[in-house]
Amino acid sequence: MGGRIVYTNEDAKYFFVGNLIDLKEQKNLTEERERVLTAIDVKKLPLDQAIKHVKGNGERVLYIFSDPDCPYCHQLEKELAQVNNVTIYLFLYPITRLHPNAATVAEQIWCAKDQYQTWQDYLLKKKTPAKVTSCTTPIEKNIQLAKTLDVDGTPTFFLKDGSRVSGTRSAGEIELLLKAVP
């Protein structure tokens, strides 16, 4: 079913596609299973193509694919501002079919003197990055990397164990995800 989880009864007479929720535990069991099935080997990520930002002691790690003009990425950045003791590897991934100016903005962010601060200023304060004449960026490589990893939307982030989380999450949810990974 196109890479989606399908539930069926014993003789496969009935099936459904969707989220299976454990109401007692208030957990989305489908999402948890998808995280495992779509995990990656984070040791193979080309970290030189990412903007690195360390908050606090940086003992926990997030690998984030994000588009500077994605509204959900803006929301995630607001939530990440409340998360401490984390190292963030930010892979700029402009999705130009949705956000035509995102590639230009991503290039300006990458070429900035303080990349992560410029990223935060743009997402949180709507401050346009300074125009740059030119610099070499990994943005095209990040687009190819995202395709290789089946990252088809932003934000998408990976935890230290390689498990995938698609979409924005609250600071509390991010904390729970980080605590669940040794």
Can you describe what each PLM-predicted range is?
Residues 17, 22-25, 53, 95, ...:
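Generic structural "secondary-structure junction" signal
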Residues 34, 106-110, 120, 140, ...:
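Generic detector of well-ordered alpha-helical segments enriched in charged/polar residues
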Residues 38, 101-105, 115, 138, ...:
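Alpha-helical structural motif
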Residues 59-135, 147-152:
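Structural alpha/beta surface segment adjacent to cysteine/selenocysteine redox centers
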